[in-house]
């Protein structure tokens, strides 16, 4: 998982995950987050409620690349320009990561307007279920773009985009 800050800063690339432990990350909720064989793993907690793992650092404009493998029939995602309140309530934009037919790469505004961009049916097969996928998320000003396995999924301009916290 790598993030590159865009022009307002030096544009340096930062490895967000060291492959060893959760240094630089803050868990929210009861889900179990841990590192196994160099991979970041999440398991449902005892109460089966939402849980999140957030970076301790904040990023404004950035270009993020994440590799993921969705093995369970669960819902996940990458929150951008969002904030956590009241335990596990996250307000902001989420780039969806979910099984086929559930809009991976789409944009959902949590505790806001709901779906901003859902993925057309013809793009649902870009997701490789049970295999490794690469998600790229680029946020600059009021624009967010997503790519899944090299294919553009979303190009959205939204004037409500503000400060960001990756979760």
Where do the language-model regions lie?
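Carbohydrate-interacting regions of secretory-pathway proteins
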Residues: 1-167
């Amino acid at each position: 998982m790598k993030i590159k800050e865009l022009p307002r800063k030096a544009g340096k690339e930062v490895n967000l995950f060291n492959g060893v432990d959760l240094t630089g990350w803050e868990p929210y909720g009861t889900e179990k987050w841990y590192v196994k064989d160099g991979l970041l793993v999440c398991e449902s907690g005892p109460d089966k409620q939402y849980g999140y793992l957030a970076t301790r650092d904040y990023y404004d404009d950035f270009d993020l690349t994440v590799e993921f493998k969705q093995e369970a029939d669960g819902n996940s995602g990458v929150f951008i320009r969002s904030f956590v309140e009241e335990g596990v309530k996250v307000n902001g934009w989420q780039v969806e990561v979910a099984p086929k037919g559930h809009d991976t790469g789409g944009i959902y505004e949590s505790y806001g307007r709901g779906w901003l961009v859902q993925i057309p049916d013809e793009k649902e097969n870009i997701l490789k279920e049970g295999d490794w996928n690469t998600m790229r998320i680029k946020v600059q000003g009021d624009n967010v773009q997503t790519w899944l396995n090299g294919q553009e999924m979303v190009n959205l301009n939204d004037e409500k985009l503000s400060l960001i916290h990756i979760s």
